[in-house]
């Protein structure tokens, strides 16, 4: 069963290859992504991150999810020597960490529900488990300068894949580096 929904400002596809999967199983994954969006959306006034950025919440009031993401963000900032930094002009934007983390959490939900063959794609970041039709999942990598062209096909099982065009990487690196000044 395969479904697509627009959540967190991006298309999210969930496909589970198992005869016992139900629409409710897939909906649980989408409900999880909606909950993540309610916590971390920079565009929702009521989100936890928006309240934090407005100074309306103190650290003791942060959700466990927020504490986890802030710790991961700090770890990543240290590992990249500051090139990845969620803070810019006093505002925290953890979206660069949240998407990948949320995909892994959603994959764990499916595994805990007993599913071993599935695909989750959230805005181009992908997590696969098991196989599709007895074969590894086939993931096409697009040319960043010609989105109609597939430059590489990966055959994968039990892997995560994230790609980005070089122009996007440069902007992210420069923005993060500038935020350290």
Regions found by a protein language model. Give the residues of each.
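Mature catalytic core of soluble alpha/beta enzymes
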Residues: 1-181
